[in-house]
Regions:
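NAD(P)H-binding glycine-rich loop region in Rossmannoid oxidoreductase-like domains
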Residues: 36-41, 45-89, 99, 117-119
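N-terminal Rossmann NAD(P)H-binding glycine-rich loop of SDR-like oxidoreductase domains
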Residues: 3-23
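Flexible, glycine-rich beta-alpha linker
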Residues: 117, 160-177
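Conserved Rossmann-fold NAD(P)-dependent oxidoreductase catalytic core, especially the SDR/UDP-sugar
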Residues: 93-138, 160
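Active-site Tyr-X1-5-Lys
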Residues: 134-160
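Substrate-positioning beta->alpha
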Residues: 145-146, 172-177, 190-213, 220-224, ...
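Amphipathic terminal alpha-helices
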Residues: 297-302, 306, 310-328
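Mid/C-terminal beta-alpha module of Rossmann-like enzyme folds, strongest
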Residues: 211, 215-279, 296, 312, ...
């Protein structure tokens, strides 16, 4: 069995590659000629050099594979067009390549995002997979367009969509900034309301993704994967302080107006950088929402999904890795 993985040189994709290797698959990874293979070093993978924008390279890369796991995508971009090129068109190209040169494909697993749906309206009513999608940002809209392409292929390919919430874990550079700030004695909480969010450790995510890819029940379906409880940032901060053995941490509550102002300034100065800003106005919109929560009941019912780590085990494991690798 051959599993083809996009985005394997990155944070989540490298863990996906490891998970499918553990399950006995031959793993083939799409990489650019210039991609860093830091997280794939020493792994017995096949490397397919190509790009999601190069249809001929994709057709060659997926030829004869059994499973495709599409992880690659843009989380930061200069404009709406870049998001749609990276997330929507790239997915469309990969689906067409799979249709053309992977006739025995058993699963096309697409990693999407909770941002496709927009935030839940209340803590008592987390978002369900069947709810109408109301993305708030160009990123969310581009991921929704990618999902639409996947769903359009349901009669042609055995597709499954996984919607992930905020993801943390070893190798992550995004939520790392939060852990670093707490290690330096500062915890910044956004707003004065009791925000809740779905969260998942990368190892729980990739285990759930692989289980979904191997289950006949999940063909044509969409699932949220996350820890079962919803967390507050106060809870996350408390677990982080304990893991860091940091007692004296200054907690700052940042008004939404300040957050949005900083986001706007970051976006402005990002226009003069060679890379798109990680924090921009649309990211600010995401950050000030109260309930980024999705129900995992469908995943539990259909293929027995259950997170094993939770923040009580996942955060200490992550921080230990950061320390061992001199990030903290």
């Amino acid at each position: 069995m051959v599993a083809f993985i996009t985005g394997a040189t990155g944070f989540v994709g490298s863990f996906v590659a490891e998970e499918f290797l553990r399950r006995g698959y031959t793993v083939r990874c799409l990489t650019r000629a210039t991609s860093s293979l830091q997280w794939l070093e020493g792994l017995p993978i096949e490397r397919a050099v190509g790009s999601l924008n190069d249809k001929s390279s994709l057709e060659k890369a997926v030829e004869g594979v059994d499973v495709i796991v599409h992880v690659a995508g843009l989380t930061a971009a200069r404009n709406r067009e870049e998001f749609f090129q990276g997330n929507h068109i790239g997915t469309k190209n990969l689906l067409e390549a799979a249709r053309n040169t992977a006739p025995n494909l058993k699963r096309f697993l697409h990693l999407s995002s909770l941002t496709v749906c927009g935030p839940a309206q209340s803590l008592e009513r987390p978002t369900l997979e069947s709810d109408p999608c109301k993305p708030l940002t160009a990123y969310g809209e581009s991921k929704k367009a990618a999902e639409d392409e996947v769903n359009a292929m349901r009669g042609v390919l055995p597709v499954t969509i996984i919607r992930a919430p905020a993801i943390y874990g070893q190798r992550d550079t995004a939520i790392f900034d939060y852990f670093k700030a707490v290690s330096q004695g500062i915890a910044a909480l956004i707003g004065f309301d009791d925000k809740r969010l779905s969260l998942i450790h990368v190892e729980d995510l990739v285990r759930g993704m692989a289980d979904a890819a191997e289950s006949p029940q999940t063909i044509g379906e969409t699932y949220f994967l996350a820890d079962d409880p919803f967390y507050s940032w106060v809870e996350i901060t408390d677990v982080t302080k304990t893991a860091l053995q940091k007692k004296n941490v200054l907690t700052l509550r940042l008004p939404h107006g300040i957050v949005m102002g900083v986001a706007g300034i970051s976006e402005f100065f990002g226009k003069f950088s060679s890379k798109p800003p990680v924090f921009n106005y649309e990211k600010g919109i995401d950050f000030v929402q109260k309930y980024w929560i999705g129900s995992v009941e469908k995943a539990k019912r259909d293929f027995g999904y259950q997170s094993k780590l939770g923040i009580e085990l996942g955060i200490p494991k992550t921080i230990t890795w950061y320390k061992e690798n001199k990030w903290l």
